[in-house]
Amino acid sequence: MVLSVVRESWACFTALERRNIALYVVGIMLYKFGLEAFNGSIVALATNRYDYDAFVSNSTSKTFERVGLLTGLNQAFQCIGAILIAPLVRRAPTKLVLAISVLAFGFFTAVLLMVDAITGGKFVPKNFRNSHPRNDFSYYGKYNTDGLIPIYSVTGVAYGMVELIRRVIPRDIVGGNVQKLRRLDALVHIFYEISGTGGAFCTALVLIPKLGNNYSFIITPVFMTMAAGTWYCITDLDFTPQIQDVLSEHPAYVKATLGSFLLFFESFWTGGKLIFTNRRFIWLLPGYAIALYGHRYLENGIAPAIARRYLGNSAWSQLIVGGSNLGELLGASFVFFFTNLITTPIPWIRLDAMMLLIVWYLPFWYPPPGQVRYAWIAAITFLPISFGWAAGDVSLAAYIQATLARVESRTKNVSALGAVMAFLYTTYIVLYAITSPALGRYIDHVFNESGGAENGGDIRPAIMNIGAVQFTCLSIVILASTFVPQGAFAFNPQMLFDQQLDTEILKAGKPDDGLNMSKPRDDGNHTGNYSIRSGGRYGGRYGSRHDCRRGSSLAYRHDTCQGTHLP
């Protein structure tokens, strides 16, 4: 069964699409492996350094307030990178923007390695590898720990560009057919999480113990460079640069200075307008942005706190994240294999909302510190939470790509798909950037008030509020959003808004098509066109199966995974 599904899915794509998909998947795996090594190391490094600073100076711990600020600012700078994508992908090939972004990311990670080496940093001592003292990190570089914040923040610009563009490029590779997009998104997510799971476990079990978290991301610049080279080999995908109307009457230097700022806000405004003025998209805000916030806070906020304060070893947060990545892998796999059975993202998003409630066990969990098997237990419990999120994310991303591909021409200076994804991604980033430092400060307050590092401080009351209570609220909001789309009250709806998306499109719909892409008539037929093809409801790269003559090369393909149908 599995092999037949894989063969059928692979046969959906043309030879050129298969080549580009293979290059894209190899690049995304290289990128993800390097990313996991960097993100896991930097959070553990910051956690240890701030704890060590408090220990040496005999001061009150502000570890998770600072770690929250570190990750929050990184997310805020991702906002800039995400917004810049919408105008950039209309002026340069997507592969070029992606390659340059990931090269910039690798460069800034190399800067941090050089700073540590210049200030006297060393690899972890051999006698620390099997039994690391709880508060001895004297082998780290002698720089101000707050110096991590600006460097990590700047990497957020490149990170935000890469994370958003990888949600846009599948549409460029295979077009607007939702069947192809669902399969491609799921396929990419599967390999992405295979690499992410391997990267997380490799970082926690090999790189950090052998090198220390100040050098465990030494592989990141290498992997990022390899990913950039791989992505650059993708074909240009029929790219045609589009002329910028913003400040077009001004000299080049004025356009260069001001145009980016205006397009930044126009992109955000366009995405917000598309979302808030149409029922088709309003539910994406909680379904995508808030769900993504919950997933990221689980990995970047709760997992480090559990690893350091419950288990006594910040490096084990990567084991927990590895379990989360494995859940994402399984979730994406389920979407891949059941794409024809579950045709909308609604059931997956509802599953995601229910799985968030698993965190209720954390405030009542008392694992003995220093035993790695309890980190594995936490990883196993994070698996189903991320399973639900990944399944919803993959399916919802394909839905967004297919829907927005049909209204691209309504936007002038920015891509409609890029603008909507940028707005959703920016909303998540702003939410995370605001809440992460505040919740981190709350964790530190509870820890210090209950005794701190010297007197058995306990963060369980904080975990009750930032974990159990917060995630219950998120669950309710996400679950409620799944009842907004027309036709979503069914347990497994076959279609939303009576809109058929599993068809090919040649290009975006006409400006006067509006967003009302499939309006039912009183007689039960449909009057809306999905694309420019005349003579039928389903737009595409091919002519209508009802209009073309026998022997014509223009055959309508309704479900490309089932082959081409001739009249």
Listing of model-derived features with the role each one plays in the protein:
Residues R66-V89, V97, S101-T109, G322-V335:
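Central cavity-lining transmembrane alpha-helices of secondary-active solute carriers
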Residues T94-L96, L205-M224, A416-A419, P437-I476:
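A membrane-interface helix-boundary motif in multi-pass transporters
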Residues V2-C79, N278-G322, S436:
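Helix-loop boundary and gating motifs at the non-cytosolic
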Residues S101-G141, A353-V372:
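C-terminal ends and interior cores of transmembrane alpha-helices
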Residues M1-L23, V174-Y297, C473-R545, G551-P567:
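Intracellular loop-helix junctions on the cytosolic face of multi-pass helical membrane proteins
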Residues I346-S395:
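C-terminal transmembrane helical hairpin of 12-TM major facilitator-type secondary transporters
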Residues Q78-A82, G196, Y297, S317-I342, ...:
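Transmembrane alpha-helices of Major Facilitator/SLC transporters
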